[in-house]
UniProtKB/Swiss-Prot annotation:
Residues 21-42 have a biased composition (Low complexity). This is QWRF motif-containing protein 3. A motif (QWRF motif) lies at residues 292-295. The gene is QWRF3. Residues 1-60, 171-220 are annotated as: Disordered. Belongs to the QWRF family. Residues 1-20 have a biased composition (Basic and acidic residues). Residues 191-219 have a biased composition (Polar residues). Pfam families: QWRF. InterPro entries: QWRF.
Length: 482
C-alpha cells in the first residue's frame, strides 16, 4: 500500500509541475469543458445518491457553534455540491463547499485543492458501499476495523493553515485577469490529475465495504460498539503547486502555519481538531443509539402493556368461565339430588304398589263389614231386645211410649223456664263451692287449735298439781320447825 501511495504521489507531483507550466500560458478554453463535464457527472452522482443519503440519515451542511462544518456519518463526504455556475469565481485555496472566509486562521484541507469533482465520484462509490452494507451482518467488524485504520491514517493529515491577511490580499486583487485564468487552469488540471489515484483507492475501499455488507443489520443495531467509526475518503499527500509572486508568498505562509501546527496542540481557535470532530461524531452516534434504545424501550413498554391488557382480559374471561362452570356444576348437583329423591320416592311407591293392589281386593269386604257394624249399632240403640221368648203388647207399649214422650216434653219445658235463673245460679254455686273449700280449711285449722288447747289444759293441770304438792310440803316443813 505504501509503495502504491508513493507512486501515486510521484505521478501526481509530475502532473502538478505540468500544470504549473501550463499556468504560465494564456488562458484557453480547454479547462472549461473539463470543468463542465466534472460538474455534470457530479450532478448525476448527486441525484443518484440522494436516496442513499436519505437512507443513511446523513446530514448535509451541519455546522458547529464556531462556524466550522462537522460531518456526521461519512467524514469528508457530507457536502457533495459543486458550483455549476460559470460566472462564479473559483478559488484554489478556498473550497467550493466551504465558501465562508473565517477570521483569523483558516483551515484548508490538503485534498480540497486537488479534488472537487473526483470527490463526488468517491462519495457515490462510498454511498453504494454503505447501501450494500445493510444486507448482511458478518463483515461489518472487519470493514469497520479497516476503515478505522484508514481514518486514523487520514486524521494524521491536518489541513493547511492560511492566515486571514493572505486571503484578504488574494481576494483584494480580483482585477488581474492573468491570476484568475492561472488559478482556474491550475485547479482544473489538479482535479483531473488527482481523480485517477483517488478512484483506485476508492475501488479498494469499495471492495472492503462490499465484503462487510453482511453485518449491516448488526452494525445499525443500537447495541453496536463505539469502535466502528465512520468511513472517510483518504486525502492525498499532494501539495499545492508553487506559483510565482503571490504563490510563493502563500507557500511561505503555508510552511509557517504548518510548522506552527506541529508545535501547537490546537490547529485553530475556530476550527476544532479531528479528535473533536470524532468525539462529536461519536456523540451523535451515541445520541442516535440512545434514541434507538428509547424507541425500543418505548415499543417494549407498549408491547408489555398490550400483553398485560391481553392477559388481564384472558384472566377475566377465564374467571367468568370458571364462575359459569361453578354455576353449571351446582345446577348439575341440584339436578342429581332431585333425581336421587325421585328415585327414592319411586322406590317407596313401588314397595307400596303391591299393598295397594291387595287393598283393591280387600275394599269390598271392608265396606260390607262396615255396613253390618252400622246396622248392629242402630239396632242396639233404637230397638228393645227380646230374649227368651218374651212378648210385648203393642198397644200398651205405644201408650207407654207416648206418656214418656209427654213427660220428656214437660221436663224440657221446665228446663227451658229455669235456664235463665240457672245462668245466675251457676256463678253463685261456683262461689259457694269456693266458700265450702275455704270452710273446710278453716275447720281443719280449728281442729288443730282445739288439739293444742287440750294439750295445754293437761299441762296446766299437771303444773297445778305439782305446785300444790310443793306448797303442802313447804307448809309441813314449816310446821315441823315451829
Amino acid at each position: 500500500m505504501k509503495s502504491c501511495e508513493h507512486e501515486l504521489l510521484k505521478t501526481r507531483r509530475g502532473k502538478s509541475r505540468e500544470v504549473s507550466s501550463r499556468f504560465l500560458s494564456s488562458p484557453s478554453a480547454s479547462s472549461s469543458p473539463n470543468r463542465r463535464n466534472s460538474t455534470s457527472n457530479s450532478s448525476r452522482d448527486d441525484q443518484n445518491n440522494n436516496g442513499v443519503k436519505g437512507h443513511l440519515g446523513l446530514k448535509k451542511h451541519d455546522r458547529m457553534s464556531d462556524g466550522t462544518r462537522v460531518c456526521f456519518g461519512l467524514p469528508n463526504q457530507s457536502s457533495i455540491e459543486v458550483d455549476t455556475k460559470e460566472n462564479r469565481m473559483p478559488s484554489p485555496w478556498i473550497n467550493d463547499e466551504d465558501n465562508v472566509i473565517l477570521p483569523g486562521r483558516f483551515s484548508v484541507d490538503e485534498c480540497a485543492l486537488y479534488r472537487a469533482s473526483s470527490r463526488r465520484n468517491s462519495c457515490s462509490l462510498l454511498y453504494e458501499s454503505f447501501n450494500d452494507e445493510t444486507d448482511s451482518e458478518l463483515s461489518d467488524v472487519s470493514c469497520a476495523s479497516s476503515l478505522s485504520t484508514n481514518r486514523s491514517s487520514w486524521n494524521h493529515k491536518p489541513g493547511i493553515k492560511v492566515s486571514s491577511k493572505y486571503l484578504h490580499d488574494l481576494t483584494a486583487k480580483p482585477s488581474k485577469g492573468n491570476n484568475k485564468t492561472k488559478l482556474r487552469s491550475q485547479d482544473d488540471s489538479q482535479r483531473t490529475n488527482s481523480s485517477k489515484g483517488i478512484e483506485n483507492r476508492l475501488q479498494r475501499n469499495n471492495s472492503v465495504s462490499r465484503y462487510g455488507s453482511s453485518m449491516s443489520q448488526w452494525a445499525l443495531s443500537p447495541g453496536r460498539s463505539l469502535d466502528t467509526q465512520a468511513v472517510t475518503v483518504p486525502s492525498s499527500k499532494l501539495k499545492p503547486p508553487r506559483g510565482k509572486g503571490v504563490g510563493k508568498l502563500i507557500n511561505l505562509g503555508f510552511d509557517f502555519f504548518r510548522s506552527k501546527n506541529k508545535s501547537s496542540p490546537f490547529t485553530s481557535p475556530l476550527k476544532p481538531k479531528t479528535c473533536d470532530t470524532e468525539s462529536a461524531h461519536q456523540l451523535k452516534l451515541m445520541n442516535n443509539r440512545l434514541l434507538q434504545w428509547r424507541f425500543v424501550n418505548a415499543r417494549a413498554c407498549d408491547v408489555n402493556k398490550n400483553v398485560a391488557s391481553q392477559e388481564k382480559n384472558q384472566l377475566l374471561c377465564a374467571w367468568d368461565t370458571l364462575i359459569k362452570l361453578n354455576n353449571l356444576v351446582l345446577q348439575e348437583r341440584i339436578k342429581l339430588q332431585k333425581k336421587n329423591l325421585e328415585m327414592k320416592l319411586n322406590y317407596v311407591f313401588l314397595s307400596q304398589v303391591k299393598h295397594l293392589e291387595a287393598w283393591e281386593d280387600m275394599e269390598i269386604q271392608h265396606l260390607s263389614s262396615l255396613s253390618i257394624i252400622r246396622d248392629s249399632l242402630h239396632s242396639v240403640l233404637s230397638r228393645l231386645p227380646l230374649k227368651e221368648g218374651a212378648k210385648v203388647n203393642l198397644e200398651s207399649a205405644v201408650s207407654i211410649i207416648k206418656n214418656a214422650e209427654a213427660v220428656t216434653d214437660a221436663i224440657i219445658s221446665t228446663v227451658d223456664d229455669y235456664a235463665p235463673t240457672m245462668e245466675g245460679i251457676v256463678p253463685l254455686a261456683s262461689q259457694l263451692a269456693e266458700v265450702v273449700v275455704q270452710e273446710k280449711l278453716m275447720l281443719e285449722k280449728c281442729h288443730d287449735l282445739l288439739r293444742m288447747i287440750s294439750e295445754l289444759e293437761m299441762q296446766e293441770r299437771s303444773l297445778k298439781c305439782c305446785f300444790l304438792i310443793q306448797h303442802k310440803q313447804t307448809f309441813d316443813t314449816n310446821l315441823l320447825k315451829h
